[in-house]
Amino acid sequence: MGKGEPADGSDDLARLDAVGLAEAIRKGDLSPVESVQAAIDRIERLDPQLNAVIHRQFEQALATAASPDLPNGPFRGVPILIKDLWAEEAGQPHHAGMKCLRDAGFTSDTDSHMVTRYKQAGFVIVGRTNTPELGLVATTEPHAYGPTRNPWDTDHSPGGSSGGAAAAVASGMVPAANASDGGGSIRIPAAMCGLVGLKPSRGRVSMGPNREEWGVSVQHVVCHTVRDAATILDATAIPFPGDGVIAPDHGRPYDTRVGSETGRLTIGVLYDNHRVDVHPDCVAAVRRTADLLADLGHEVIDSHPKALNDVGWTEDLSGAFATNWAVGAALSVDHLGERLGRELTASDVEPGTWTMAGMGRGFSAFDYARAQSVMARWRRALAAWWADGHDLLLTPTTSLPPPRLGELTPAEGEPLRGSQRSMPYATFTSPFNTTGQPAISLPLGASEGLPVGVQLVAAYGREDVLVDVGSQLERKVDWSQHRAPIHA
């Protein structure tokens, strides 16, 4: 299939970010209905090539956009897509990539707090995006809905688990889309589709009421610009009653940090990893970014938390993370079975999911407690590096460029092949799900025409520093106009 078929003509609205589109609506250049209808037209035109949007809410979206009750928030009339995994909307499907939920016609009975915040900000939800089953692999090829294709080259994956979201934004269907990240699932698809992907600190964006903050997953968006990542975070970073973890507030709205002068920061660099061979193009992107940061006046040094490249530390963490991941899969299968009203069986889920959930059920309470202890020691070991006076860490986002479709899926007799082959793509991202630190992937590299990203990591609670420096890099390299071959 290759590069796909570009759309005829160019949609000027599709070149606006969410902040820019909201400004155009406020100025009267177009109405919320016109904004939403344009997004619907783009989805209908582009999605047959990509399979990014699996549930369409077009009639509801147009009615919402036309309603006098549409909230007059910062994104009034801007269309958005929601990932079909844990971001729930009452009365709408929530299938988490699972055939059993699809076949049962399962719908949610409540809005996630984050979805409520989107609505209060004036966003208009136009549909839900594809995701691998329970978000367990770094590609988006669920049995339930089929593969999502990368708009830069449709033979390749857009990444996962927010691959549907990333493909939709990269092709210009909507300016931003909800995404989640439990091991890299915001940052990996952002890197593979040439987008900005900010993973907030644990407890910054509430997972309530149906999910918890103590795990490794967080939610936010994939988008084209740092100002969108910042301004949408301002709109959604409001705690929900009963949240067990709430990230510290640094007082100043994130959107006011866009374009801020920071003075000279100390930024460490990690180019490689002892666990995998990093592709030369991914290393080259980091070297180029290090040069850009130095040109901006920052001190860029060859330094990183030693635990990131220590064999003993990383092997211990890999085991602990795998335990946590498997237990999470088991809990998710049980939770969704309860909501469906029956116990799920092997025939209800993909082989990899069933195998991983079985592993999770097989761990003892001691195994799980030990994993939490290892992860706590890891958090403290990494935090010490930032406490010693380092402001940011620069790494590749992924070790490899985007894979071809089918490379990260299970094989006959190898149910965990997808998860195992996903690991090199999450080598640089998953450690910061463990620590809960904020990290951002920026589209500052390429490999044979496909995007690759670089990652900046800040201390816990310091998304403001990521916005500061990310926007400085964005001014120096205007990536927002770099468009995929399949784009509106």
PLM regions: where:
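Glycine/Thr-rich phosphate-binding loops of Rossmann-like dinucleotide-binding domains
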Residues: 90, 134-136, 186, 277, ...
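Enzymes and membrane/adaptor proteins characterized by extended Gly/Ser/Thr/Asp/Glu-rich
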Residues: 74-114
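Amidase signature
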Residues: 1-71, 235-426, 434, 461, ...
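Short, well-ordered beta-strand elements within core beta-sheets of diverse protein domains
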Residues: 20-27, 81, 101-106, 217-224, ...
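Short glycine/serine-rich loop segments
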Residues: 108-240, 393, 433-434, 438-446, ...
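Short glycine-enriched loops at secondary-structure junctions
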Residues: 79-87, 130-132, 201, 398-400, ...
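A short acidic, glycine-rich active-site loop
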Residues: 101-108, 153-156, 414-426
